[in-house]
Amino acid sequence: MMNTMSSESKKQKRLSEEVCKELYAKYETPERVIKHCRAVGETGARIASALNKAGYNFDVSLVRAAGLIHDLMRISDNHGEAAADLLESLGYVQEAKAVRNHMRYEFNAPENITETDIFCLADRLVKEDEYVGIDERVDYLIDKPGKTAERTKILIEKREETKIFIKALEIRMGVKIDSLFRNDDSAKKIDRLLKRVEKPARYIGSEKNICKKKPQNKLRFAFAFPDLYEIGMSYMGLQILYNILNKEDEIYCERVFAPAQDMSTLMCEEKLDLFTLETKTSVRDMDVLGFTLQYEMSYTNILDMLSLAGITFKSKDRAEDEPLIIAGGPCAYNPEPLSDFIDVFLIGDGEELLPHFLREYKKSLEKGVSKREFLKSIVKTDGVYIPSFYDVVYNEDNTVKEYVPLIEDAPKRVKRALISEIEDIPFPERPMVPFIDTVHDRAVVETFRGCTRGCRFCQAGMIYRP
């Protein structure tokens, strides 16, 4: 990744907090505005520091100073211009540049971000004197006196643009911006709950041969098995895909399983989000959440897991800053029962399709591309079915009659993804070793895929017929 110093970050005369206090007094800045400025300064500084940990070299003091002084003349007309002119006259050139257009600022492309981008982002995430995030901040602005349909439309458009920009920063930081400001005591909650549940080893992680990575500049993928740990850890496909994905430098695959009823109840009581085993990260903070669909009886568990994670159920209602929800596995060949809840189905063999899909999504996040635009770019790929791009026509007996594409590039028939040679699959040489007995507590060997018999009632026999 780039690690060049921002053009704004060369050291010049820097505005101190003491000078800010003097200017507040001189220009009679209201106390509530001063508190807001301080909150913006600290918010921007925290984001800049997180980016620096990921390899950037931003001037944190400049970001903080711009926040501290940006609303100095809030009670004046064109307060940004007025404050910038004053700062320039005092020799604070960089602060003046950042402050001048902060009300109408257009973010740079993610690869060209500067201290001004970070400060202006922070200003959009703070309401009054506290960090609240982009949704609450925009809702607050929409409901202010003078509300009009046109202003509301503009604010909503700006909110979506800001969310895309935030996602581009988060993929570089390896953490969600919200998590930088969350009073996160999840680890302590988990430790407390483990003493109160049956089989706590289901939730510990740290098994032999698991993968631990630094999350910076990684696409974070939660591999979700919608059933208990001891069932999911028996699944050879999890071992194969976990091994393949974590060999990719730009992807970090972590695991999550459906908690047992005792743990699920306690998580709801303690307001603890569903978390990954490897890093105990909230699943809602992942970039992609992928479910393996092994049997239909697990479908209600998928909804339970979405609920525990705090993720919106229906795909059409899901926000830009929520994870992309994907699903694969044998039941993905009949996607319609879950089509309202899944953004993308990956149909067929996943050993090549899933890494390719995740690599492409990471590129789109880094470029600041919206989810919908990314999905449009990937829709022609074999094995990719995107329910929102199709209208499903049913027969009288409720069987599917046809799929009608709603966008030009969507193929009328989605082809499954296939691996031509099973010998080419990189099976794990060091499989994960569970802490507790699994339902199939033995070594697994895959000799071939499918079935040579081809019985009409058997999915495996029909899917892999030559």
Features from the language model and the residues they span:
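Radical SAM [4Fe-4S] cluster-binding motif and immediate context
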Residues: 420-466
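Short N-terminal or domain-adjacent regulatory/targeting segments
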Residues: 183-217, 267-275
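Charged phosphate-binding loop/patch that engages nucleotide di/tri-phosphates or the phosphate backbone
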Residues: 150-184
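Glycine-rich beta-alpha loop elements in corrinoid/cobalamin-binding modules
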Residues: 259-405
